[in-house]
Amino acid sequence: MRKFILIFLLFKPFISNSQEDKVALDLLNSMSENYKKMKGFTSSFTYTMENLTEDIKDSFSGKISVKDDKYILFIEGQKIINDSKTVWTYLEDLNEVTISDFDPSEQDISINNVFEIYKDGYRHKFIESTEGFSIVEIYPEDENKSYFKILFKILDNNLLSSFTVYDKSNSIYIYSIDDFLEEELVSELFTFDLEKYPDIEVIDFR
């Protein structure tokens, strides 16, 4: 009898973790499907970086428009356009644009791709649900990643309220969605027309 109880106690946490993983995956899938069905969206956000070791905290605002694999990002004086093949980074103060080929493997975690990132190479864990939102964490299976955890705060309407990246240097990167607008965006919006910028300096790495 004691042996049976011991086996049961060992097996019980496994069941609990499995159920938590399923809840987490269901929440992430519902969020992802919600964004995938949109014809486009524009979001304002606040980006905060904290380093607990160095006692550093920095914060600034940004704006992003997304359609499928394309996006336009405005942040810290930069306008970054990605049409899923080419990336233009425009610095208005310098009237300078840098052009490069888009490499998905080099893409940072951001509001344009975080809805899909959990699908491959991550473990999932449900943390809790409170009034209005749920919290889910994912952990990369690749130990060479610079971060060890991403925390999602998902609203009950399957929109993302915020996500937080925890890296191995004891830094925390928080992306908080300030406002969100679902809207239809034309593909022509996601390109950089050099003719509209007289005397611009072009740095082409392609």
Give the role of each language-model region.
Residues 48-50, 67-69, 76-78, 85, ...:
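Solvent-exposed coil/turn segments that connect beta secondary-structure elements
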Residues 42-45, 59, 73-75, 165, ...:
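Extended beta-sheet lipid-handling architectures
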Residues 122, 129-198, 203-206:
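Gly/Pro-enriched, hydrophobic low-complexity segments
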